[in-house]
């Protein structure tokens, strides 16, 4: 006969029940999860079984069941200080943050307690040192340490999101990850090619979605989030469903988002009265003869869009030492207008009547096998198979023209990752593994004519082939790699790590005769190999100082976008360059951290210097066999004379910078946090500016916990200005999007003005089932733009959020 033995799990700080605590019997291999009230019944465990109580936000506890009495309260100590955080992404294995020599950041649901990011791009701004660029409503391109787009690696659940057509300008692919499906997001700063391979120059952003937990007791959990932005007319509806059983578990996430046109701020502290105002617009459904007046110029028309996301995860227990996780994700958006393009002026008129991205679709299915049975060569291992299907397109029609350019890209990406983990008795560990990826790119392009009648425009059946954005006949890109990382505890206070990775990349691109811009290129084969390494050391003093130093190298092998893209912007045409080679980054950094005795307060500073060899950048490029114009630097493209540029290896470059962060917690539940970021960079050979070098920026927040049910936060973020002579010549940073000034001789661009905004957030918990959140952003209605952005940020706006369980 078995008797009930119920206990309650309590937070040791705020004395509230802790739900979702996993209890695992070491000898019985049985497991349970505490309910929403922190209650759990231990009757199924033998009295001599050793129970392990674990939760991602609390320190684990081991205790023999016989020492626990009916009705006991077990107090869990929260993981509240930086040194005790567990990081999953560095070296693709769990590691205590106190032993990591690189700068890392972690974003969890607790960090978002007083806010609801609209997209995963917005989510990344909560980490220190990350700037997000936008050119349209459905955008968000993160920049880390002066690197952006395909120089920052995005990963979701262990699968690379970067693919063969990730470009070097700005990307919006991060918005295809639903922020409400995430359990945690980790950011590794600086070159991280040992663990992740090509593209990880500026750093790695690793999204971890929620995983369902297996439970001996059948259990349902259902949660919802409803959000409405009063001024911007944004609506977000998110639903979670989780089911746990003895042998399997399921997690389902469904989300729909509808974003209205972005309304900019009205207070122009920068002094430019007309900058960014959307005074006129065109009706894209009509053959435009003239501009239409916008009754509210602060409303940036054509920035609205919609998106829905779906995720399904299954967790199957295969044996006592293995499980399988099936992961299905799908994201789909509406058409997304390119706001900066629709406001491009040429000869006094709008250049485009239409310019939009077609629906951006990302589908992923993966199977992850975890094995925890100890063997001679490993204690644990993981095997991950993944397939991704990506679809994107671009559509544009020039002002007063009856033909539309359509460029359509489809990708199929296959990948395999195999990772092994081995702990040794001499306080050392080894992580090693293998990776293979294959990208197949299908690129199409055509011109479609419209018929004009009294009732308006109508699509015709007239289609004409035009040059594709990427190789039209064939586009393949593959990587194969092997890596290892060894870690050793020298003493209780110090440790070091050393790692190495060998990567081989292969690219094949082929154009058909109708799509050749450069007649010297019709078939390109490229093969590159690279060895990258990392070396780190950490020292932790007895008085809570941490000193870390790290050397790491990274590389980026040219992908199909780098070598074979054809793209026109502002009269400049990007053309293919078959001679492009990989670029390399060599990074040295030093970190210093100080923690209080109770670990509640911290201060940290990280400084780094990155040397870039064979830097890939855009430069003027002559197509020697072109005779369409007398000027060797231009060609005729789409009936217009344009300047030709290409990606080239432009010698050596450098980036250096520093970041500072602090956290102060007071006994009466006041919490103050802040971080500052400084970056500089240029070319070693001619000291020309590099793209994506952000001006000095930072943020501060002041939080007060009123009681167990309510708290509020006041936050402040800012950015200094950037002068026009510090913008890159390739145009990646959008100097033309900055204010125009008269310098006494001519009209010139002034560069990006400085700005600062304040936000107020407050939450109230009605019960364990209902919670409200109110966010008043940009309180003083300041007009500003993020650096390199082609769209103004929202002005004062109020967001209302309701979270509920059912």
Predicted regions and their residues:
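Transmembrane beta-barrel wall of Gram-negative outer-membrane proteins
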Residues: 232-259, 264, 269-334, 361-363, ...
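Short acidic/polar hinge/loop motifs at secondary-structure boundaries
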Residues: 43, 161-191
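N-terminal periplasmic accessory domains that precede
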Residues: 68-75, 120-123, 140-143, 154-155, ...
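Outer membrane beta-barrel strand-and-loop segments of large Gram-negative receptors
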Residues: 409, 413-419, 575-581, 587, ...
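Flexible loop and strand-edge segments within Gram-negative outer membrane beta-barrel domains
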Residues: 301-307, 317, 321-378, 387-411
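Gram-negative outer-membrane beta-barrel transporters
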Residues: 491-492, 504-505, 608-611, 629-728
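Short, acidic, small-residue-rich periplasmic hinge/interaction motif at the N-terminus
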Residues: 22-26, 54-58, 69-113, 149
């Amino acid at each position: 006969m078995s008797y009930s033995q119920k206990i309650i799990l309590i937070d040791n700080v705020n004395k509230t029940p802790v739900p979702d605590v996993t209890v695992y019997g070491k000898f019985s291999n049985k497991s349970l999860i505490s309910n929403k009230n922190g209650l759990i019944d231990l009757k199924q465990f033998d009295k001599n079984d050793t129970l392990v109580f674990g939760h991602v936000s609390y320190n684990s506890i081991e205790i023999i069941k016989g020492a626990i009495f009916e009705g006991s309260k077990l107090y869990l100590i929260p993981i509240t200080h930086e040194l005790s955080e567990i990081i999953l992404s560095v070296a693709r294995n769990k590691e205590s943050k106190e032993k990591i020599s690189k700068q890392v950041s972690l974003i969890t649901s607790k960090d978002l307690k007083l806010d609801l990011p609209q997209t995963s791009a917005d989510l990344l701004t909560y980490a220190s040192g990350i700037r997000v660029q936008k050119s349209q409503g459905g955008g968000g391109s993160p920049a880390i340490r002066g690197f952006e787009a395909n120089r920052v690696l995005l990963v979701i659940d262990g699968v690379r999101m970067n693919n063969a057509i990730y470009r070097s300008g700005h990307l919006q692919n991060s918005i295809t990850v639903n922020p409400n499906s995430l359990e945690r997001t980790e950011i590794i700063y600086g070159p991280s090619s040992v663990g992740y391979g090509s593209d990880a120059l500026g750093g790695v952003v690793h999204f971890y979605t929620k995983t369902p937990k297996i439970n001996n007791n059948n259990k349902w959990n259902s949660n919802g989030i409803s959000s409405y932005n009063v001024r911007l007319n944004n609506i977000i509806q998110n639903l979670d469903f989780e089911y746990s059983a003895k042998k399997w578990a399921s997690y389902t996430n469904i989300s729909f988002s509808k974003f209205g046109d972005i309304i900019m701020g009205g207070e122009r502290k920068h002094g430019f009265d007309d900058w960014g105002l959307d005074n006129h617009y065109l009706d894209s459904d009509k053959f435009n003869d003239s501009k239409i007046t916008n009754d509210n110029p602060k409303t940036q028309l054509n920035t609205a869009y919609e998106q829905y996301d779906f995720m399904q995860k299954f967790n199957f227990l295969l044996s006592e030492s293995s499980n399988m996780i099936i992961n299905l994700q799908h994201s789909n958006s509406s058409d997304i207008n390119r706001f900066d393009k629709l406001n491009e002026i040429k000869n006094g008129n709008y250049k485009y009547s239409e310019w939009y991205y077609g629906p951006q679709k990302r589908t992923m299915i993966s199977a992850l096998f975890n094995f925890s049975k100890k063997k001679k060569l490993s204690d644990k291992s993981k095997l991950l198979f993944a397939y991704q299907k990506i679809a994107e397109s671009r559509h544009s029609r020039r002002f007063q023209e009856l033909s539309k350019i359509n460029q359509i890209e489809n990708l199929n990406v296959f990948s395999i990752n195999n990772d092994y983990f081995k702990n040794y008795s001499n306080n050392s560990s080894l992580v090693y593994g293998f990776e293979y990826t294959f990208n197949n790119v299908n690129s199409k392009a055509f011109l479609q004519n419209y018929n004009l009648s009294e009732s308006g425009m109508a699509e015709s059946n007239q289609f004409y082939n035009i040059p594709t954005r990427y190789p039209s006949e064939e586009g393949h890109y593959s990587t194969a790699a092997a890596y290892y990382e060894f870690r050793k505890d020298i003493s209780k206070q110090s440790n070091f790590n050393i790692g190495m990775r060998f990567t081989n990349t292969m690219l094949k691109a082929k154009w058909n005769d109708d799509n050749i811009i450069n007649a010297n290129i019709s078939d390109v084969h490229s093969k590159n190999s690279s060895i990258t390494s990392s070396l780190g050391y950490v020292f932790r003093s007895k008085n809570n100082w941490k000193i870390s130093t790290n050397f790491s190298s990274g590389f980026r092998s040219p992908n199909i976008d780098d070598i074979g893209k054809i793209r026109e912007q502002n009269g400049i045409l990007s053309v293919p360059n078959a001679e492009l080679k990989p670029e390399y980054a060599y990074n040295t950094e030093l970190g210093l951290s100080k923690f209080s005795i109770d670990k509640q307060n911290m201060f940290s500073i990280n400084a780094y210097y990155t040397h870039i060899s064979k830097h890939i950048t855009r430069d003027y490029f002559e197509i020697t066999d072109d005779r369409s114009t007398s000027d060797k630097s231009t060609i005729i493209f789409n009936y217009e004379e344009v300047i030709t540029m290409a990606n080239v290896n432009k010698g050596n470059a450098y980036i250096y910078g520093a970041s500072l962060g602090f956290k102060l917690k007071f006994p009466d539940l006041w919490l103050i946090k802040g971080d500052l970021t400084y970056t500089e960079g240029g070319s070693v050979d001619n000291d020309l500016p590099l793209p994506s070098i952000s001006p000095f920026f930072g943020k501060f927040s002041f939080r007060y916990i009123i009681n167990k049910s309510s708290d509020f936060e006041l936050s402040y973020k800012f950015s200094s200005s950037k002068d026009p002579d510090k913008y890159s010549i390739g145009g990646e940073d959008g100097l033309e999007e900055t204010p125009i000034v008269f310098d006494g001789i001519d009209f010139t661009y002034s560069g990006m003005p400085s700005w600062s905004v304040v936000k107020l957030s407050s939450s109230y918990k009605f019960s364990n089932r209902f919670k409200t959140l109110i966010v008043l952003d940009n309180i003083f209605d300041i007009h500003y733009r993020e650096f390199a952005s082609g769209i103004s940020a929202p002005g004062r706006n109020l967001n209302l959020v309701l979270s509920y369980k059912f």
